[in-house]
Amino acid sequence: MYPFFAMLSRMKYINRWGLMRNTRSENICEHSLETALIAHALATIGNEKFGKHYDAERAAALAMFHDTSEIITGDMPTPVKYHSEEIRNAYAEVEEMAVEHLVSMLPEELRQSYRALMTMGGEQDGELKTLVKAADKISAVIKCVEERRSGNHDFRKAEQTITQSIADMHLPEADYFMKEFLPSYGLTLEEQDYTREAGLKFAESSQMVFSKVLK
């Protein structure tokens, strides 16, 4: 019996933003999925817009596993994690130990594949690691936007700081996402969904489909 995937399912119990007042809690499971979606988007943007040759599916997979060590370590607040080089190094060592502990819960023949996912240690993962890092930051900005929209001003400074850190990466894929996609996260469902004309067109099309089924 191997409990690896059962342990991964516990990601939904690990909440992020422990030092912040949240109007809605966010766990590392949902954060990992959002980061994976964004990492895939950044890779696709790079390929289609900037002539890169990223493996978008690999980027998404790396992002899905990027916080798995926190099942063991918990989510350490960023100000604490990066307070000093000594703490950063110590935490990195603990993360490595956590990964090895999780990997030990797999059959021997699967361990290297999942270790590479969890550490981004594959042969082609170097450039993708940067995309995942950017996607991780963008996901954090999205959380800040959502909290601000809910009237919670505790995330205002975090939003400014993380947004600047993304700009400082000088990553065209991330800059493109921030310009073209991020603003819609501040809209209501009605504003996000469709223009009135497009919405009516969809409604008409869906009615036609259902009418055929019901005949």
Located regions from the model:
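Alpha-helical, largely C-terminal catalytic domains
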Residues: 1-215
